[in-house]
Amino acid sequence: MAGGTGCVRLWGAARCWTLRRPLLAAAGGRVPTAARAWLPRGRRACDASPPWALWGQSPAAAGHWRGLWEANNRSGGGAFSGGEDASEGGAEDGASGVGGSAGGGEGPVITALTPMMIPDVFPHLPLIAVTRNPVFPRFIKIVEVKNKKLVELLRRKVHLAQPYAGVFLKKDDNNESDVVENLDEIYHTGTFVQIHEMQDLGDKLRMIVMGHRRVHINRQLEVEPEEPEGENKQKLRKKPKRGKKEAEEDGATKRPLEVVVGPGPSPAGEVLMVEVENVAHEDFQVTEEVKALTAEIVKTIRDIIALNPLYRESVLQMMQAGHRVVDNPIYLSDMGAALTGAESHELQEVLEETNIPKRLYKALSLLKKEFELSKLQQRLGREVEEKIKQTHRKYLLQEQLKIIKKELGLEKDDKDAIEEKFRERLKELVVPKHVMDVVDEELSKLGLLDNHSSEFNVTRNYLDWLTSIPWGKHSDENLDLARAQAVLEEDHYGMEDVKKRILEFIAVSQLRGSTQGKILCFYGPPGVGKTSIARSIARALNREYFRFSVGGMTDVAEIKGHRRTYVGAMPGKIIQCLKKTKTENPLVLIDEVDKIGRGYQGDPSSALLELLDPEQNANFLDHYLDVPVDLSKVLFICTANITETIPEPLRDRMEMINVSGYVAQEKLAIAERYLVPQARALCGLDESKAKLSSDVLTLLIKQYCRESGVRNLQKQVEKVLRKSAYKIVSGEAEFVEVTPENLQDFVGKPVFTVERMYDVTPPGVVMGLAWTAMGGSTLFVETSLRRPRDRDSDKGDKDGSLEVTGQLGEVMKESARIAYTFARAFLMQHDSANKFLVTSHIHLHVPEGATPKDGPSAGCTIVTALLSLALDRPVRQNLAMTGEVSLTGKVLPVGGIKEKTIAAKRAGVTCIVLPAENKKDFYDLAAFITEGLEVHFVEHYREIFDIAFPEERAEALAVER
């Protein structure tokens, strides 16, 4: 034994000479060679439990030491109690110690399963808080501690041969900290554990602990800090030699106190030590119920072990621990609960239960849940394993089949099959020579690459795109004008300019015998059918249709593709279009070209320059394909709401076609022909169930949908029919007829109620005409005297002023100042005695101040309003005008003539004044728009003055006579 490992551990465990002397005597007076590092260094005696209780990790060594202890006591040798006489007796004559030991005969046979001696009462324990699973008695658990104060306390306890602690479960499973600031954070019932092994991991301490019994916390204890070890060593070196009695007295008086128990409240801060008491279970009788529960627990444990072999080691450890667990209901209940993976509060309930039958019942409930979970896991495991086996078997069979086919010559290699597939695609296509050279080169490179390399997949994808382009493949176009016109008229009402341009394109293609691509741009307000007419054009021409939107696009790669060097690279939209349509002459709609963005990845509008240039797109170069592609036969149609935001070079490459808004009559026709039938079909109705008359549609257009397009009108019609469907299904009515009287029940109150602000215009107020996104509208200009004019030339400043309000833009403000200057000059020529505009302070306002207004077309209207105020005469009633006026009075042309004319007619105007250069725009309007209107085309403002103030003209003529 002297040279064995067990003796070395025993020697190290005996931390004072009082404990080492009997060991030395039993070993024949020889200190083990491997144990010389354990020589005493001023350690104090320990009055704790017997030393072998420290060595749970070496039960054989502990058993051997206990045998020496008992043999020494029987022979009368030196005791382990630390008595001085006994110690000397055992040390002075090593032979007598050995003889005494031999005289008593050999000690009892000690095995690895000999139970360790644990103190029955140990009230003061370090507190270790754990999460998720509590420690049950007779079970081992690995615990890690990071709290530095607690680590130091545990080391000190083990150093003093008191390797015991209390392990308690935290109430909050999410609290990973091992610092306990309040006893309310933990359950008060825990386990008294013995520390078997400690491993220092730097920032934390890992321990193997074994539970022994249940304990309950009484209160918190305060820990007194230990003196530094360096000071103790210095004191020991300076100690003079003293007698035995002095040493005993000094040892008794200077023994360190580690725990201070005070009657006051618990100290604030961390809880490191607690006072505990043992928890005793209630007395019980082994009744039939207990026997039945015990038997059922044993059966369930065996079932779980049969399903899950991972539990066998834990159960065998309990079975070999020196007691028959199956005969002890107390241990059996703990083992049953510890084997489960139940919730922490359920395990704590088992730990706190003192009634053994109830504890057995709770443990059995947890075991049953675990058994069901184990069965489910086993079933899922079998299913997964079966699937894996099937997949593996299928893979093996497929590989064998490939080899067999290859040996028989029935199947070619993967690379050969890929090459054959690509060449098969190109057989029916007219591939240009430069493209075919690239294909051959890539196929040769593909044959040299490994199937599993990344370059192989990149090359294969490139060849897939390159061979998917419809080289030389066209769709048969329809060059029949009558059929094309019928298709266009069938799908859309109005839009004569667009239809005429498409028919012209067909006529030119018919005369040439071939078609060429064109780039058209339809611009106009929202909802007028720009996008939908493109689909109808594709149907009329019998071309494939492809649409993509560039609104908000900021990446050039969306149009021209990515370089092949990028991961996941792919071609741009145009190449994708050719692959999808499988023709070289599709109709491509580029939507919202006026809303294209610009970002750090480039300017997409610049990328469109090459695409939409007829001279360049015959050799369009995509970044991904890197070979020229012919797009000269593609018909490009772009759509936009406004043209100002389209870059000038891009606008120059497109043929701009204006798609103006619809008038009320056109909207009514569209609603009756298209919108109402479509909405009826969408709502599951027919004419026998719901009826909308023309009067209802007219009222909808007039009071709810004044915008240029028909999208809002479509929404309102669908709303009416949805409510009609609800009434029919709910049983309120079998037939719903919508009339002008009950229209508000379906769509709510009217949005537009007043056509014009003034039925009779007073002096200083003139009706103008304006263009808006919703079409045209009337715009009144009001003028008023801001303060009385100064008639005394000797006092004050005779020069007047003009204040402008109504949220006007800069252009309109400049137009107002020009009109004010011209009006003063014109009035001086017309009536030199009238100084009103020279000396008065005038306020000019354009109503509806919340609506921003801008543009130069109100110049004539402002001049007329100022002159009306100065002459104190109203203008001709039911008169409206538009036109920009220069500083010399020349009337300049403006835009939006159609919308403004429609607005004037809707407001009941009978006479309108337009610039002479807008005569061509007016005569392009439909007859039903211009019918009933008196139109005057003017070049100078003098003509407008004669029209607006006929009385002034009559007076002037009378004076001349």
Swiss-Prot record:
Domain Lon proteolytic: 760-951
Domain Lon N-terminal span(s) in chain numbering: 125-371
Disulfide feature: none
Composition skew (Basic and acidic residues), residue ranges: 245-257, 784-801
GO biological process terms held by the UniProt record: cellular response to oxidative stress; chaperone-mediated protein complex assembly; mitochondrion organization; modification-dependent protein catabolic process; oxidation-dependent protein catabolic process; protein quality control for misfolded or incompletely synthesized proteins
Catalytic site positions: 857, 900
Descriptive protein name: Lon protease homolog, mitochondrial
